Amino acid sequence: MSKPCRRPTRAGLREERGNKRRQEKALNAKRCAMGPRPPAPAPLPNRCSTFATLAEEREAREDAVSQQTRLLRKELPALLGQLEQIPDPRDPRKRQHKLTVLLLWGLLMFVFQFASRRESNREMTRPQFLANLHLLFPEIETLPHADTLYRLLRDIDLTHLEQAHVDLVRRLIRGKSVRRYLINHCHPIAIDGSQKLAGDTLWAEELLQRSVGKDETRQTQYFVYVLEASLAFHNGLVIPLLSEFLEHALGDTEAQKQDCELRAFARLSDRLKTRFPRLPILLLLDGLYANGPVMQRCWRAHWQFMIVLKNQDLPSVWQEFHALQALKPQALQRNWGRRRQHFTWVNDIDYAFGSNRRQHLKLHVVVCEESWERVDQQAQIVTQTARHAWLSSQPLSRENVHERCNLGARHRWGIEAGFLVEKHQGYHYEHAFALDWNAMRGYHLLMRLAHVFNTLARFTRQLRDLFRQFGVRGAIRFIRTSCAAPWLDSARMRGLLAEPFLLQLE
């Protein structure tokens, strides 16, 4: 006798979908009764083209290209002025392109999200693309071969390129465009590491190494690892700031230890303090940095911090937290979006560390336990829970716990979302572009600088509707294809580009 079929019937599937819709409707009504919710990002529209005529499409493409170009050209004078200070190592008798034109071309290669030097060679040197680039950027009269940029990046000092990036962010901060997104009057900067690429060839002595595989298949792998710093605001705006490459020789050679993320953090924090000596900063760090030397370095730099505290880290701090919480509980319950949150915190916990535990810090610990409801695959409303804990440099209170935790510490994920974008959404973070250490770093810095410009374009009011209509990659593709085809009318574009541009972030 055959077993009964467990596959649901068409009627059963229809009934299950109906039950799920009813449960979701009831759950949404319950959420609305709890109070206002933060607006969720609207999904991309699934519809046919909104352009009814060729003239409408041409006008939309010209407007999009002009707005993006005006944003770039607003910063180009200062940017190119700094890049002109880079000593040019090339033979003056053989130079066909100015150093600034080469670096501008490299920047545009990443702004338009070309995947490789070969693709940028093939696409950007087409006559129509070149004519449009010259219309948008008169500095570009002819385009070089991509290998020319490679040879330049291989030989130049990249300090000026990095400084140009930092000064761009500094002008943005001074312009007060991000003031309403500050946390306790501090600029939230997330720091995290990411692997850039890995392989079995030692093509540069700076590469880190590790053993991969088991027993018979065990082999040495060489890889590039970068510690990144980015401004991470609670509205989703993430602005790349600094990059620190880990190098094999910068480790402890006597103990035969290569470079690590904590050593790189010490170097990156020194550079951050040098570049922004008086900027109020709130560092957002993961659990790796929950240790005495890192927190002491933050105190000496006069920085605030919010650091993830895992259950297995700092047992003495956890022991004192539980003891003091029982004696003098401090708590707050609130709704945040779809989540019900319960905060508990303890201030002024003494933490001893270092040789013979002679060094002391006053820490403040906050724990957030939250729950939310969702509809599962069986059309049942289920409750899910999560628990988060952080170390804070400042005392917690009912007035600041939401801002420091929900709007600050939780948005450390912004830098991880930035890694996702740079790796899988057009910037090709994991592509070396050159098997030369200095050139590879140069391409990386150009990529991060291009990411800044595209991020500003996404959040500026002038291009808001374009990015909402097409999405981020779709909008960049729309602008790129507009430059690659005869869409742009020279007379109208010159008029549009002559208009002043005011950066207004959403």
Language model region names:
Residues 213-280:
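Electropositive, glycine- and tryptophan-enriched low-complexity nucleic-acid-binding patches
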